Amino acid sequence: AFCGLVGLKPTYGRVSRYGIIAYASSFDQVGPVTKNVKDAALILEVIAGKDEFDATLSSKAVTEFSNLQAPKKNMRIAYITETIETEGIDPEIKAAMYNRVKALQADGYTVEPVSFPYLKYAVPTYYVLTTAEASSNLSRYDGVHFGYRSPNATDLESTYKLSRSEGFGEEVKR
């Protein structure tokens, strides 16, 4: 991460999404943000596993992620060149990334750059998919049955309009 933290996005079905307001179901996942990989593994051990309120969960046993040791021999790690060699990356961040690559290589890992020329399409693709899912998932938050109800509404139509325009954030209103 560019901020010195470890973010872990678990495999779909590993951690319950029960209690989360669905924005874009195929993207919504729960995972820890920690100071190091070991802490992320420990938290994943706690939050992973069965939940009777989430039918999408895997029944596979939870691994002791914190006890896993990556074999250095024959281990290949790739990084996407376009994430580092792009306009706007702070020189200190770039240097830290390349220093980490060197440290991993010194530890015995094979670290290679890979190009992903389609990276520029990731954000537009994200918005196409998530806005479609969000419009479906959030449609029930009408200010009548679910969600925020505007105190400024005077009739049913203004309840819908004001509750959604006042109650939803900018990301949802795109």
Regions found by a protein language model. Name each.
Residues P91-I93, V123-A132:
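Short glycine/threonine-rich loop-to-helix capping motif typified by GTGT followed
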Residues A1-G4:
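FAD-binding core of FAD-dependent oxidoreductases
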Residues D107:
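Conserved dinucleotide-binding and phosphotransfer motif residues
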Residues T110-S115:
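General small-molecule cofactor/ligand-binding pocket signal
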Residues V6-A95, R100, A153-L162:
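A short helix-breaking turn/cap at a secondary-structure junction
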Residues P71-R76, A132-R174:
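Short helix-loop capping/hinge segments that flank enzyme active sites or metal/cofactor-binding pockets
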